[in-house]
């Protein structure tokens, strides 16, 4: 038996397809999402509809984004789903989620069992639309969820952590074993809830500066910030900002990174 075939569909490696088939896990995710009729619900990567069917059963309408043409066609002809779905057969990385929210007239509730090979870049894409998103629920590789929820002074803490927690309140929901999927992935999975901040705890004037600093620091995470950020800050400036220059990237909190970004933005802004 070919374990890459599920419900007559051959799972494509290039799309990172692993299909959820554990009913307890499915029910737990739908309960966590708690969709309500009238909300603007968007699913990324519906696949064979394991989550789509129970969510759509509670809704009058929902939007799905599916890159695989065969799967999009299956959904379009699904007897229970076809009249409830707006299907975008395209790459979620190219979707303007602000436009979807504008069409819906309200912020989006986004969910999905994300292909693990694109989950991190897709998260960064979604972060740029948090003003148009009410909440997000995603199945991800457990290691990625650990990075999203990590605190300073841990190996899991990195650029993804800082940027995710800058934009959202990040809450782990559920751990999922490989046996819940066909074909079974080689890693454990987990579900996470991300709720964009209504009032950002650590406002940053220029998010590009925060992205630049965190990229530079974590690309050289073994170095002290005195060295990794040496072209941006002198040791004296770091001390003035409350940061010991001998710390490494993983020792600096989200609030401190935001403080660094705001300070650097102020230095870059021409004084009147």
Swiss-Prot record:
What cellular-component terms does GO give this entry?
Answer: cytosol
Q: Which Pfam families match?
A: RrnaAD
Any idea which GO molecular function terms this record carries? Answer: 16S rRNA (adenine(1518)-N(6)/adenine(1519)-N(6))-dimethyltransferase activity; RNA binding
**Top class in the EC scheme:** transferase
Q: What is its EC number?
A: 2.1.1.182
Where along this sequence does the record place binding of S-adenosyl-L-methionine? 18, 20, 45, 66, 91, 113
Specify whether Cell cycle is a keyword of the entry.
Answer: no
At the top level, the lineage of the source is: Bacteria
In which broad location class does this protein mainly occur, judging by the first location in its UniProt entry?
Answer: cytoplasm
Keywords for the protein's UniProt record, in alphabetical order: Cytoplasm, Methyltransferase, RNA-binding, rRNA processing, S-adenosyl-L-methionine, Transferase
Family, according to the entry, reads as follows: Belongs to the class I-like SAM-binding methyltransferase superfamily. rRNA adenine N(6)-methyltransferase family. RsmA subfamily.
According to its UniProt entry, what is the function of this protein? Specifically dimethylates two adjacent adenosines (A1518 and A1519) in the loop of a conserved hairpin near the 3'-end of 16S rRNA in the 30S particle. May play a critical role in biogenesis of 30S subunits.
Q: Which NCBIfam families match?
A: ksgA
The protein's name is: Ribosomal RNA small subunit methyltransferase A
Species annotation: Yersinia enterocolitica serotype O:8 / biotype 1B (strain NCTC 13174 / 8081)
Q: What is the gene name?
A: rsmA
